[in-house]
Amino acid sequence: KIFEKWDLDFVIIGKTTDTNKLTLKFDNKVKGEIPINALASQAPIYDRKWIKKKLPDKKIDLKKLKKIKIEDALIKVLSSANHSNKNWITSQYDQMVMCDTAQKSGADAAIIRIHGKEKAIAVSVDSSANYCKAHPLTGGKQIVCENWRNLISVGAKPVAITNCLNFGNPEKPEIMGEFAECLIGIKEACEFLKYPVVSGNVSFYNGTNKKNIAPTPVIGGIGLISKFKKSFGHQFQDDNSAILLIGKT
């Protein structure tokens, strides 16, 4: 009914049965049958060796930090490409197609309204390869928490996440260790926040010229906004807008 309503092409390719088998037919003749358990609970499980990442024992030399002028540090931070205006990207496509976008790009999460409802969906996709490379366990936690923060910053209640886990060669114990520790971090953060993982994907053997990529788990989360007209923007509304700092810095 949904596909017909929006005039979308579709075809029914099968139906759910209670045979516990995946049955393949062609011209109404059975061409193959596969036990479902072989694709799920009875699928082979790899138990690869992995080692915990040895973190560098680095201590900050405060004497060296004192030599940095606060003016120079501020200019260096503000001139970073990470803080530059992104309009040159977002202005090249129609952000308001079908008028479903509740606010323009630039916020920590995108907001899409639901037809005929006051509700809206917030979406955020996050990753931090450098963080996960430095400390896989904390990096895994941080990505989930960042995704959560991005959703609540626009007024959404986080509902669920999916993931795309991108890593190097898992046959190398140190790479498998990055994978394992990132997963532990993601798991612990999701359990603490009660943030269910509804789907996911793993991509191994990523690298160039025999050099593995940094551990790059990507988290995509959605949240629900009960009334999209009350969603939060990312810009100051007037000169007297308050700035709230949450947590220690």
Say what each PLM segment does.
Residues 1-249:
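Glycine/proline-enriched, intrinsically flexible loops and inter-domain linkers
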